[in-house]
């Protein structure tokens, strides 16, 4: 009986130490650095992405604003500072809920897709933006007359870049809510919605979407729908 108690003592002692060490490891894995965000005021923000916003070779955080300006946070002097000064990017009149960045037109620079949603479901008032840069100024590819027939005027929730062929050429999957899913690619310098051709134009309550090597070595898509 005594030997059994000793064994149990050691067993539970080891278990206790493992729990303590695990908790300590978890506690030290992340560090709260919120204090380095300059002007970190309360606001509604639902989306974030990372890209080289100003083509200086460094990446910035792109943070959406839902009724607030979109931000481009750059790490400078030990702080995360908003370096955006362009109205078309901040877009305070829109309610931006998602953002993704990838080189959709194969020019070596990542374009920025802002998913705007001003209604809960179905038809919305303001279309999304696909921002490209020229002479250090952003402009919206969707505002070009040739691209207006493919505007997304459906409420959405999430957006993700997808390399569907595995060749480094990206398309943009837009999870809409109460309307068909969109899948944009650029073909012959025109924005094309390829969702129907790819059998993705389902009408559902699209909530979330992620792309990666989930089941195969190609870029799979996991879509969370209601």
Where are these predicted regions, by residue range?
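Bacterial N-terminal signal peptides that target proteins for export
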Residues: 2-13
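Beta-propeller-forming repeat regions
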Residues: 26-226
